């Protein structure tokens, strides 16, 4: 049985390193691996010994924490219907779109194509009886997200009647054939957690852990690519809690009441892991249940444009004639997309359960290095290097 357990853990720890995939689970035996101190000699307190003191029971470890999520499985969290848009254009004649209607939300049920999240931090753990850890990380995180334009509600106004655009004209089309991607800045992040060895038998350890992480990065660069509208915005600002229509100044230098595009990241996780010590190497395998959310308060960001036309242009949006053979000069804004904007919808985990495999290398019971790969609910890699004081 022992040989079977050793073989299974070694195969999982080494074989899965080729296919990297929440938060790291960590080695369940980690609280009891470093039993000697770099600066002070280790002394484990026995809770059943009446002569033991808390000074014997407590120790501190510190080190580096790196977590790299290459593909988090996320979806957008929106309602089935969207309110405040104009009616769907029909026929060939230009028209006014001033009456709001409820329409199916093109973002509903959409998944993200790519979601990356990278964290580098300092690690600090308070150890009790060489069995339980209470730990925290303080560092910096940044991310990258990519999805179809439908997932972020790229909308605009086309086919509008008249020689000017009234302030009450509503967007009437949703652009689904496009891509939206954005990068966040690198900002402060933190996490707290606890880990403990629940059961030990010989060299095997069964443990559990809980973690919570948080960060509030701002969008650094937004890139929207579609046929009717294409634009890039550095450090975008937008409207929160503002119903359609957006102000006519939206996207210009004269825009007011805009706010920074800040994403609120929250994640919690619980995990259960099994490890087996093989001299200096301690492989482990675990399962975890996690929930992550990325919420930008549904901020709506308008396409950048000129406040006044130059060479008859306010944006680089193309003129769309379709079957027409000549421009409609009486409705001069009907043939290209106006007041285009996107909404950064709330994103959350699409799969909650995942698997992690890893191994810890120990040196002199004072130093350790851990590598971990995670699968199913994300593809991620984790590295942890620490020492005991």
From Swiss-Prot:
| GO biological process per UniProt | monoatomic ion transport; regulation of cell shape
Q: What is its main location?
A: membrane
Q: Enumerate the InterPro entries for this protein.
A: Major_OMP_Chlamydia
Its record classes its membrane topology as: Multi-pass membrane protein
Write down the superkingdom of origin.
Bacteria
Where, subcellularly, is it found? Cell outer membrane
Is Signal a UniProt keyword of this protein? Answer: yes
State any GO CC term: cell outer membrane
Question: What keyword terms does UniProt attach to this protein?
Answer: Cell outer membrane, Cell shape, Disulfide bond, Ion transport, Membrane, Porin, Signal, Transmembrane, Transmembrane beta strand, Transport
Q: Which residues form the signal peptide?
A: 1-22
The UniProt subunit note reads as follows: Part of a disulfide cross-linked outer membrane complex (COMC) composed of the major outer membrane porin (MOMP), the small cysteine-rich protein (OmcA) and the large cysteine-rich periplasmic protein (OmcB).
Q: Which family does it belong to?
A: Belongs to the chlamydial porin (CP) (TC 1.B.2) family.
* Role according to the record: In elementary bodies (EBs, the infectious stage, which is able to survive outside the host cell) provides the structural integrity of the outer envelope through disulfide cross-links with the small cysteine-rich protein and the large cysteine-rich periplasmic protein. It has been described in publications as the Sarkosyl-insoluble COMC (Chlamydia outer membrane complex), and serves as the functional equivalent of peptidoglycan. Permits diffusion of specific solutes through the outer membrane.
- Please state what the protein is called: Major outer membrane porin
